[in-house]
């Protein structure tokens, strides 16, 4: 059972287009199967309701800016005193501590700080951002893996724990080539935007054909690729 806590006026996503039969398709897509409760967590009554739910909860997931949960008596120290076996996962842009922790942020902000957007687009043109929230999605997947691991730890006799997941750490891990190339060459090799091509690998890119675009990766199949091309 998953219970989503929303403000009294409802989550903003409920208003997003497109609407069908009075419901947002976006909201339904991301919340299907969840139960919802509208609670004013800034009030004593609302906090008491949340504390009651915590007593029987296995997992709490929150994505407020760091400090908001503590301000509303819903921080880890408070909740683990109520339920020592609780698994709590806090998701934020920059993590729960550090020099950027108090800054708010969302997917595209995280992509910018992590250097993702700087590598998207044509070499001498403006960087671009994709119309996909892959930072949000990937961070959710990382959180899922961490939560399941924490639950397994608890099943084997461990205690509850607080998990800190940040968008910027997840997005930075996307640099499967960039970071190690820069580091191993002493900064001599700088990843660059390359448009439809790859800045390092030959035989990988997007090519315009007669009726559509074709993406080719022929790294270990170069001879086969050239034969297929005639």
What are these regions (language model features)?
Residues 1-159, 190:
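N-terminal helix-loop segment corresponding to the beta1-alpha1 unit
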Residues 113-230:
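Acidic, glycine-rich segments within the central catalytic cores of soluble metabolic enzymes
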């Amino acid at each position: 059972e998953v219970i989503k806590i929303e403000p009294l006026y409802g989550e903003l996503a409920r208003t997003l287009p497109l609407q069908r039969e009075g419901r947002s398709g976006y909201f339904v897509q991301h919340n299907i199967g969840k139960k919802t409760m509208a609670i004013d967590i800034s009030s004593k009554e609302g906090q008491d309701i949340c504390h009651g739910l915590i007593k029987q909860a296995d997992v709490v997931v929150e994505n407020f800016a760091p400090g908001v949960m503590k301000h509303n008596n819903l921080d880890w120290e408070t909740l683990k005193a109520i339920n020592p076996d609780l698994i709590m996962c806090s998701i934020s842009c920059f993590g729960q501590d550090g020099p950027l922790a108090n800054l708010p942020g969302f997917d595209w902000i995280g992509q910018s700080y992590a250097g993702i957007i700087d590598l998207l687009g044509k070499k001498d043109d403006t960087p671009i951002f994709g119309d996909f929230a892959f930072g949000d999605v990937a961070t959710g997947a990382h959180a899922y893996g961490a939560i399941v691991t924490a639950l397994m730890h608890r099943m084997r006799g461990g205690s509850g724990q607080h998990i800190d997941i940040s968008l910027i750490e997840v997005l930075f891990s996307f640099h499967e080539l960039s970071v190690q190339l820069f580091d191993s060459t002493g900064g001599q090799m700088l990843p660059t935007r390359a448009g439809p091509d790859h800045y390092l690998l030959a035989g990988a890119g997007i090519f315009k054909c007669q009726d559509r675009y074709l993406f080719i990766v022929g790294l270990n199949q170069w001879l086969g690729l050239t034969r297929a091309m005639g």
